[in-house]
């Protein structure tokens, strides 16, 4: 095999030219056809007795094409290994030809860039700290009660306010004529939920049971119906009932409904606090890890392999499409392109390259002890921890994902021990449920 490499003065793209004997390919084709002959079935012949000439005539072209692909792929990776080239992404093959008893082809590809790490002491990182307060726990208890709340009809004189639920009929009209989809009966609507177009729920506030009213609203410019977007219409509203929230008492039945067999309010509060503290710990670690990696990547100037960026952008787009499709949206209606995900893809590829260099330079790896401790911590949040532990034991890919988390954690700790840090205290809500 003859190999020549064309290296640019700048940039990551290389070109490799390869020449190899076609005899190797001929030999592989003969071997594959001989294997096929043993099992191939054709009318008029017993299994395994089809003449080789017939097998060649029927399958020779297809097999040669398959063997050519395998040969080119294998020889390419042998060639780049011989030249000590560390390729990034997939190669593009060109100029494939057979002549004078040789297979000749070229391939262009990118190589991984050299990454020069900054001194960690030069980094400035803003980290967050937080704690679960009694008020946070009280809010969570209230949310749990709201999950199991009931609606109770109020007396006939009560005026509907935000947070109440009304049972209504409505008829929508445009220029005095009813429009399609604008009419419904006995609809439950929580005021302030934002379910309806702007102004609709506000127009019902202050109404009482059996009251009728006509309100005027304007559909948003981005409304899905072309006939209605931006149009001002009226709705005839009839209120059948005004209902208020009734929260359940924190009694034994309520507590046990969350799987807490003690059935006491104290046990519920302790369980909630424990879960919130675990969630907060994970969120703080994630935010601080992200801050560290962003600060590190910002200090590094490196050319990114475009093939890796394109692959990452496509993967991000596919992931987003899957989420939209799970919501019932059609891919063709969404109009997503990989180009829209390029900035995020570039950031991820850059962080990946920098992390790889840190791992290599400082010989960082996940230990078995750390992996087992991580699994134990994850399992403790489940009803049957042993089942979770056994699941991880049977899933090597899940263990690799844990190793990646642990390595990033060790890198984060190492950088934080040397970098200039500024600690900012934030509330549980700010950390766990930041505003969009």
From Swiss-Prot:
One of its GO terms (biological process) is cell division. One of its GO terms (molecular function) is peptidyl-prolyl cis-trans isomerase activity. Its EC number is 5.2.1.8. It is found in: Cytoplasm. One of its GO terms (cellular component) is cytoplasm. Its main location: cytoplasm. Residues 163-248 form the PPIase FKBP-type domain. It is an enzyme of class 5 (isomerase). InterPro entries: PPIase_dom_sf, PPIase_FKBP_dom, Trig_fac, Trigger_fac_C, Trigger_fac_C_sf, Trigger_fac_ribosome-bd_bac, Trigger_fac_ribosome-bd_sf, Trigger_fact/SurA_dom_sf. It comes from the Bacteria. It catalyses: [protein]-peptidylproline (omega=180) = [protein]-peptidylproline (omega=0). PROSITE patterns: FKBP_PPIASE (PS50059). Keywords: Cell cycle, Cell division, Chaperone, Cytoplasm, Isomerase, Rotamase. Gene3D superfamilies: 3.10.50.40, Trigger factor ribosome-binding domain, Trigger factor, C-terminal domain. PANTHER family: TRIGGER FACTOR CHAPERONE AND PEPTIDYL-PROLYL CIS/TRANS ISOMERASE, TRIGGER FACTOR-LIKE PROTEIN TIG, CHLOROPLASTIC. NCBIfam families: tig (TIGR00115). Belongs to the FKBP-type PPIase family. Tig subfamily. Involved in protein export. Acts as a chaperone by maintaining the newly synthesized protein in an open conformation. Functions as a peptidyl-prolyl cis-trans isomerase. Consists of 3 domains; the N-terminus binds the ribosome, the middle domain has PPIase activity, while the C-terminus has intrinsic chaperone activity on its own. This is Trigger factor. It comes from Hydrogenovibrio crunogenus (strain DSM 25203 / XCL-2).
């Amino acid at each position: 095999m003859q190999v020549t490499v064309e290296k640019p003065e700048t940039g990551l793209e290389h070109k490799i030219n390869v020449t190899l004997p076609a005899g190797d390919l001929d030999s592989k084709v003969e071997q594959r056809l001989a294997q096929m002959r043993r099992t191939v079935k054709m009318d008029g012949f017993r299994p395994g007795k089809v003449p080789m000439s017939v097998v060649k005539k029927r399958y020779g072209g297809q097999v040669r094409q398959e063997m050519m692909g395998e040969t080119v792929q294998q020889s390419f990776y042998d060639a780049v290994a011989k030249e000590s080239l560390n390729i990034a992404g997939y190669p593009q093959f060109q100029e494939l030809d057979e002549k004078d008893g040789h297979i000749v082809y070229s391939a262009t590809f990118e190589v991984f860039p050299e990454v020069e790490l900054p001194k960690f002491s030069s980094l400035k990182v803003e980290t967050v700290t937080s704690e679960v307060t009694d008020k946070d726990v009280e809010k969570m208890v209230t949310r749990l009660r709201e999950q199991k709340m009931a609606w109770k009809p109020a007396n006939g004189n009560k005026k509907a306010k935000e947070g109440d639920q009304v049972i209504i009929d409505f008829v929508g009209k445009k220029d005095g004529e009813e429009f399609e989809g604008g009419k419904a009966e006995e609809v439950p609507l929580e005021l302030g939920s934002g379910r309806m177009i702007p102004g609709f729920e506000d127009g019902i506030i202050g109404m009482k049971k059996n009251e009728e009213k006509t309100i005027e609203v304007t559909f948003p410019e981005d409304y899905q119906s072309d006939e209605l977007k931006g149009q001002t219409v009226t709705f005839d509203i009839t209120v059948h009932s005004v209902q208020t929230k009734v929260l359940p008492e924190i009694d034994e039945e309520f507590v046990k409904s969350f799987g807490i067999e003690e059935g006491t309010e104290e046990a519920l509060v302790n369980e909630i606090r424990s879960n919130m503290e675990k969630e907060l710990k994970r969120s703080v670690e994630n935010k601080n890890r992200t801050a560290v990696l962003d600060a590190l990547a910002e200090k590094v100037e490196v050319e990114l392999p475009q093939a890796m960026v394109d692959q990452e952008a496509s993967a991000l787009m596919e992931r987003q499409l899957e989420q939209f499709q799970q919501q019932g949206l059609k891919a063709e209606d969404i109009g997503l392109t990989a180009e829209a995900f390029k900035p995020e893809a570039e950031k991820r590829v850059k962080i990946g390259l920098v992390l790889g260099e840190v791992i290599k330079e400082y010989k960082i790896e996940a230990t078995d002890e750390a992996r087992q401790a991580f699994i134990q911590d994850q399992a403790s949040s489940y009803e049957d921890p042993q089942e979770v532990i056994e699941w991880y034991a049977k899933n090597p890919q899940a263990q690799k994902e844990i190793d990646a988390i642990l390595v990033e954690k060790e890198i984060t700790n190492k950088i934080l021990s040397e970098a200039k840090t500024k600690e900012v205290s934030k509330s549980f809500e700010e950390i766990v449920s930041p505003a969009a």
